[in-house]
């Protein structure tokens, strides 16, 4: 028992299931970060579209902006800098998320190496590949017989 507490019992999972749970948690975090990045990149793209659409227009022209669920009338001169600031802020958040993503990927890779985790999806793909190959054989046989 002394060896368990000496090795940092909180850091070492007690069994295989705990390792699996920790691994799945890390993969889930990565998935959430990817999802957040995708959403924010979409917002950056939308901000760019708005900027490109209103930039060439007369600066005193009316435009409407949604602020906290309320549509507010402003001028392009007032709205354009705010939209640009929002876009810049979103781009900064995306950059930070990419940095976090790289750290989490490295952490996951180290975790996989430490516990010798191998993805078993390759076996699933082989089984799926055999099924597809069986289907493909039927197609190939038909194609082969028509070419003879």
Swiss-Prot record:
Induction or repression: Accumulates in response to cold.
Compositional bias annotation for Basic and acidic residues: 122-134
MF term (GO), any: unfolded protein binding
One GO CC term on file: prefoldin complex
Stretch list, region Disordered: 122-148
Pfam families, sorted: Prefoldin_2
Similarity field: Belongs to the prefoldin subunit beta family.
Protein name: Prefoldin subunit 2
Taxonomy of the source species: Eukaryota, Viridiplantae, Streptophyta, Embryophyta, Tracheophyta
Recorded name of the encoding gene: PFD2
